[in-house]
């Protein structure tokens, strides 16, 4: 099966992190990123809220915000990462990464605004965000 995939702003992909798949939102259209010398994009993931575990409440998504969301979840800004287009595309083609429904505009705006608010955004991620995602 051939899947044509190009990462685009507001897109979403399912990546295996640890033992579970997590939804990652694509924060920008691919750009040449000199630090990695290739086309890249910023991705940030969504993870479940467990009431007995501390979490970043900067951006909470609930049922209705995205088809994947089945219960309250939060954007895990501290684990946002810059991903290479070539790597992700080849993993999608191999079936190791699944493509999910894109993000609605209003939800996407909330996610992006969180990069300016969350105290957990790493400096290199904030720099990438400010240069390529705004």
For each feature predicted by the language model, list its residue ranges:
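Mixed-charge, Lys/Arg-rich low-complexity intrinsically disordered regions
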Residues: 1-7
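General secondary-structure edge motif
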Residues: 4, 57, 91-92
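Alpha-helix initiation and capping sites
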Residues: 5, 18-21, 37, 71, ...
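Loop/turn positions that initiate beta-strands
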Residues: 10-11
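Compact nucleic-acid interaction/catalytic patches
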Residues: 15-66
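C-terminal terminal-subdomain/extension
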Residues: 65-134
